[in-house]
């Protein structure tokens, strides 16, 4: 009798995706983040589901309902802390996953990469609408400031903003629809993840060398299931430590004050994972220009496959490009720091220089470095 997992229509799909999947024999720990992101998504959906059972999306009771979850619901404090810090873990894994893709040339799987960028944008949208739900000061003012950016769109801008608000300001209608968006988007993300994996399994994984790994493949199970399990244990350890010991470390103290439309907080800033984009937005003194730069900061990822000039896929054997990659990493950390600082000198000029460098590195310097390295590697006989 043949094995059930190889014949049953449903089991067959699971088998080809997670058990008998041929995987390169030399993929490093940087390839763990895909599975970690899957686990993060499951954690967020489950904790979110239990939070939604007790949350009320009404301006009068939203803040109180979150306090009620933390005080009166069995393990409500834990569910809420896991959900809030789970978002931080999600973005940490996302940034590392994208960084891995850039470093090792995974973006040359164009369909997988493009779906990945759409996924990144969808997760960012989900996190933004989710941050509004507790209806604290930073929730309210964050929603007001970011939705207001759409008014920079010529002609239809102000109409569009009022349409999204469902009125003339961020109010009950806005909160209700943001809750609806926050509930539906994770399921859309799940569908996109399946498409992401579908495209990935068409080509198979890349590997650190950037060389075609077809000649040396090993089954996913048990080799990479056990490796992913180790990554999972480490991530759960970090997440639980955060949620148990310092759950509010990454949050904003202003969000412990109920939303008040009459009182603006001194420094409006998003969660840490949006600070780099927020810094780029603020570095341009023009409203429409800032919005376009904000969009470009993420959408620039879509043109990375077109900017690949090197004959080698990975940066593993390309020292000049490696230096530029780590400059880009340091630059993003600088932007993250600047995004959390007040709008005053020297932070303004640092933010502007870091924003220029961010785009220059991706669009100009890295493609040039690829061409230079190719030229240096060409045999030059007399």
Swiss-Prot record:
Heme b b562 binds at residues 83, 182. Its cofactor is heme b. One of its GO terms (molecular function) is metal ion binding. Binds 2 heme b groups non-covalently. GO terms for biological process: mitochondrial electron transport, ubiquinol to cytochrome c. Belongs to the cytochrome b family. Heme 1 (or BL or b562) is low-potential and absorbs at about 562 nm, and heme 2 (or BH or b566) is high-potential and absorbs at about 566 nm. Component of the ubiquinol-cytochrome c reductase complex (complex III or cytochrome b-c1 complex) that is part of the mitochondrial respiratory chain. The b-c1 complex mediates electron transfer from ubiquinol to cytochrome c. Contributes to the generation of a proton gradient across the mitochondrial membrane that is then used for ATP synthesis. This is Cytochrome b. It comes from Monodelphis adusta (Sepia short-tailed opossum).
């Amino acid at each position: 009798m043949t094995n059930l997992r190889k014949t049953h229509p449903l089991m067959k799909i699971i088998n080809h995706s997670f058990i008998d999947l041929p995987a390169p024999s030399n993929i490093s720990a940087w390839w763990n983040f895909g599975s970690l992101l899957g686990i993060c998504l499951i954690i967020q959906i489950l904790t979110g589901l239990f939070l939604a059972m007790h949350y009320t999306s009404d301006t009068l009771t939203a803040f109180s309902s979150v306090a009620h979850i933390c005080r009166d619901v069995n393990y409500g404090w834990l569910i809420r802390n896991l959900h809030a810090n789970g978002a931080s873990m999600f973005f940490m894994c996302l940034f590392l996953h994208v960084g891995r893709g850039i470093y090792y040339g995974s973006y040359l799987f164009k369909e997988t990469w493009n779906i990945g960028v759409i996924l990144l944008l969808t997760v960012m949208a989900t996190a933004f609408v989710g941050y509004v739900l507790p209806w604290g000061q930073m929730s309210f003012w964050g929603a007001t400031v970011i939705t207001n950016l759409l008014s920079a769109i010529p002609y239809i801008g102000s109409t569009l903003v009022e349409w999204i608000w469902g009125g003339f300001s961020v109010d009950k209608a806005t909160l209700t629809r943001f809750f609806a968006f926050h509930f539906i988007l994770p399921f859309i993300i799940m569908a996109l993840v399946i498409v992401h994996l579908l495209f990935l399994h068409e080509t198979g994984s890349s590997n650190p060398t950037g060389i075609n790994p077809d000649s040396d493949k090993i089954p996913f199970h048990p080799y990479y299931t056990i490796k992913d399990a180790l990554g999972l244990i480490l991530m759960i350890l970090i997440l639980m430590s955060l949620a148990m010991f310092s759950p509010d470390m990454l949050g904003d103290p202003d969000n412990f004050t109920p939303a008040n439309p009459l009182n603006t907080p001194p420094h409006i800033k998003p969660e840490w994972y949006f600070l780099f984009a927020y810094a780029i937005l603020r570095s341009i003194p023009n409203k429409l220009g800032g919005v376009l730069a904000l969009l470009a900061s993420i959408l620039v990822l879509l043109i990375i496959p077109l900017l690949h000039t090197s004959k080698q896929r990975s940066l593993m054997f390309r020292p000049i490009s490696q230096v530029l990659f780590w400059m880009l990493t340091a630059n993003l950390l600088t932007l993250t720091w600047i995004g959390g600082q007040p709008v005053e000198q020297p932070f303004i000029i640092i933010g502007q220089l870091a924003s220029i460098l961010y785009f220059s590195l991706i669009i100009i310097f890295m493609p040039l470095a690829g061409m230079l390295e190719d030229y240096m590697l060409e045999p030059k006989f007399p």
